[in-house]
Amino acid sequence: MSRILLAGGGTAGHVNPLLALADVLKVSGHATFALGTSEGIESRLVPNSGIDFFTIPKLPFPRRTSRHILCFPFKFFSSVKLVRSILIEHKIQVVVGFGGYVAAPAYAAAISLNIPYVVHESNARPGLANLLAAHFAKCVGISVIGALPCGKLVGTPIRRDLTAAASFDPVLAKEKLGLDPVRKLLLVFGGSQGSAKINMHMRAALPRVLKLCDEKNYLWQVLHITGYGDSIDVNMPHYSSVRYMDSMGYALSAADLVVSRAGSSTVAELCTFGIPAIYIPYPFGNGEQRRNVSHMESAARIIQENDLSQIRLEDELLELMTDDERREAMSIAAKRFAICNAAQNTASLIELALSS
């Protein structure tokens, strides 16, 4: 039995692959530990999964010259010292990083103690921590060809409960969610943080879209996952909204079309389920979401946030919601982008790092 520390946090895109990999490692008999921050989504999801969880302060790299850049080295080395103590106390044998705020101190601590580490990059464009750390890693796993020049294509690990849900009966899934089992489902979500702009334009577009679909005898309903920051109640026929959903397996199994951000985990999950999508990439960061779906025109429509409007959404939605054959072709194309057994593939890299 090996002792493995998984470092990642901040967004679901870092945390969900961590949880999926932890499942596989536990089945193989490894002792797994997780490192994150107390502020990110991992502070809720990881402890609920039964994994020993350690936190360090959130420490984003300052992108602009300011007093924060002067303090950064001291705070960074303080975090490295904290991670070192965790690695020593729990006799960690390999560190696995998924990027994000906690990965860089974890990599640095591993190097200082001569502990091998593995880098996993889910995005088409890596963040700074993974970009630098990949040069010294024992193994590097990627989800998009070319993301890191030394990377092996392994895919983005998906939680076991979600992969199992890919075979659910969509009608039963709709009933589990309290939805109409006859109407097709448009699922809308803006990533783990939600998106005020997507929420606003979607609510403006839906009344006309649903009305015209009904008139043409294309019967649809909407499940809108708005995010915790949204507090607007909307009374609209065939429209349901929730701030967060724990049972995403049922939601994805029931969905006939999705409107969402283009985070790496979201894209991997939709491809696994074969769901046609309208992606609205998050425009900030280092542009990774745009890159994540730039090669997927056959499986999705892509709207850049600068082009997002009520009229554009109405046009895209109506075109897809009234064309069953096109959605079916997009579904088939999406499945071709899915990488099966990504968690097992990544676990194999860890075994390689442990044995070398």
Swiss-Prot record:
Subcellular location: Cell membrane
Record has Membrane as a keyword: yes
Metabolic or biological pathway: Cell wall biogenesis; peptidoglycan biosynthesis
Enzyme class: transferase
Pfam families xrefs: Glyco_tran_28_C, Glyco_transf_28
UniProt catalytic activity: di-trans,octa-cis-undecaprenyl diphospho-N-acetyl-alpha-D-muramoyl-L-alanyl-D-glutamyl-meso-2,6-diaminopimeloyl-D-alanyl-D-alanine + UDP-N-acetyl-alpha-D-glucosamine = di-trans,octa-cis-undecaprenyl diphospho-[N-acetyl-alpha-D-glucosaminyl-(1->4)]-N-acetyl-alpha-D-muramoyl-L-alanyl-D-glutamyl-meso-2,6-diaminopimeloyl-D-alanyl-D-alanine + UDP + H(+)
Superkingdom classification of source: Bacteria
Keyword Cell cycle annotated: yes
Keywords annotated in UniProt: Cell cycle, Cell division, Cell membrane, Cell shape, Cell wall biogenesis/degradation, Glycosyltransferase, Membrane, Peptidoglycan synthesis, Transferase
One function term, GO molecular function aspect: UDP-N-acetyl-D-glucosamine:N-acetylmuramoyl-L-alanyl-D-glutamyl-meso-2,6-diaminopimelyl-D-alanyl-D-alanine-diphosphoundecaprenol 4-beta-N-acetylglucosaminlytransferase activity
Function: Cell wall formation. Catalyzes the transfer of a GlcNAc subunit on undecaprenyl-pyrophosphoryl-MurNAc-pentapeptide (lipid intermediate I) to form undecaprenyl-pyrophosphoryl-MurNAc-(pentapeptide)GlcNAc (lipid intermediate II).
Record's protein name: UDP-N-acetylglucosamine--N-acetylmuramyl-(pentapeptide) pyrophosphoryl-undecaprenol N-acetylglucosamine transferase
Gene that encodes it: murG
